[in-house]
Regions:
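Loop/turn-to-beta-strand initiation segments
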Residues: 57, 88-89, 134-137, 169-177
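Short hydrophobic/aromatic beta-strand immediately N-terminal to the Walker A/P-loop
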Residues: 29-32
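C-terminal regions of RecA-like/P-loop NTPase motor modules
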Residues: 1-2, 226-257
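Conserved P-loop
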Residues: 34-110, 121
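Phosphate-binding/switch region of NTP-binding enzymes
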Residues: 172-238
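Pre-Walker A adenine-sensing motif
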Residues: 10-22
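Conserved nucleotide-binding/hydrolysis micro-motifs of P-loop NTPases
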Residues: 64-68, 76, 96-100, 144-145, ...
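Phosphate-binding/switch loop-helix module in NTP-utilizing enzymes
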Residues: 99-162, 166-168
């Protein structure tokens, strides 16, 4: 008899329908998309809905935006992370200095020499914050900035694997965001991080008749009966909305290696 896999409902309209009833609980998944596709919005909405709809505390780890800028952007969608933080339901780790400070890195109260900074150092901060608030949902946005610092592909792969394994050990359902890297105009290659995560969500902008449309697609999701078809989505004043029963008349982008 096939064992039923526990699911984490996202709360995002339409997304649970194309992911077989939510994300596999306690797994690490990748949200892959172009700049402006709404990766950060989707990941933040996953945390916001987790707190308000399912009483699941959340942790956001930013490798790009400062806390101030991120909070200001999320308020536009009606997500009050500041109040949640005061109530102990949410925590923010600002790791954005890793790309701007040449001599040292400061993550929270921890200062690390740039030469000695490693993924494991950051993970110690993540573990500490996640434990402190009993985080059931964790977002790392965007992991691509960390990957880009490794010139050697084997080092990059090991770094991603270390990250995925450490996040899995927290027991939380985790989302990593990463930039979709194109090859030419119409194609792309599978990226290192895709092979190492439990599932992949693709967010793209594609030709839709005489205009452009947004599509979201489940690239893979282990232990899940998923909808592989690209589905349209919109970024509204309330966040991401997926339309699981609709399709676009678009020119398919080659997703093969």
């Amino acid at each position: 008899m096939k064992q039923t896999v526990a699911r984490t409902l996202t709360g995002i309209p339409g997304l649970d329908e194309i992911t077989g009833g939510g994300f596999p609980q306690g797994r690490v998944l990748l949200v892959l998309g172009e700049p402006g596709a709404g990766k950060t919005i989707l990941c933040s909405q996953f945390l916001a809905d987790g707190m308000t709809k399912f009483a699941e505390n959340g942790l956001f780890v930013s490798l790009e935006e400062s806390r101030k800028h991120w909070i200001r952007e999320m308020v536009q969608f009606g997500w009050d992370f500041t109040s949640a933080e005061k109530q102990g339901k949410f925590a923010f780790v600002d790791a954005s200095p890793i790309r701007t400070i040449p001599g040292e890195v400061k993550v929270g109260k921890l200062t690390i020499g740039k030469q000695d900074f490693s993924l494991m150092s950051l993970l110690e901060v993540i573990r500490s914050k996640a434990k402190a608030i009993d985080a059931r949902r964790i977002v790392v946005d965007p992991v691509s900035l960390f990957i880009f610092q490794y010139l050697d592909e084997s080092q990059s792969r090991k770094a991603v694997l270390d990250l995925v394994e450490a996040l899995s050990e927290t027991g939380a359902t985790c989302l990593l965001s990463s930039e979709l890297r194109r090859v030419g105009i119409t194609g792309r290659t599978l990226q290192t991080e895709e092979y190492l995560v439990h599932g992949v969500i693709l967010m793209q902008t594609v030709p839709n008749g005489s205009t452009m449309g947004r599509i979201i697609q489940v690239g893979k999701m282990r232990e899940t009966d998923i909808d592989h078809q690209p589905r349209p989505y919109k970024i509204t004043k309330n966040g991401i909305e997926v339309y699981p029963r609709e399709s676009l008349a678009w020119n398919l982008i080659d997703m093969r290696t």
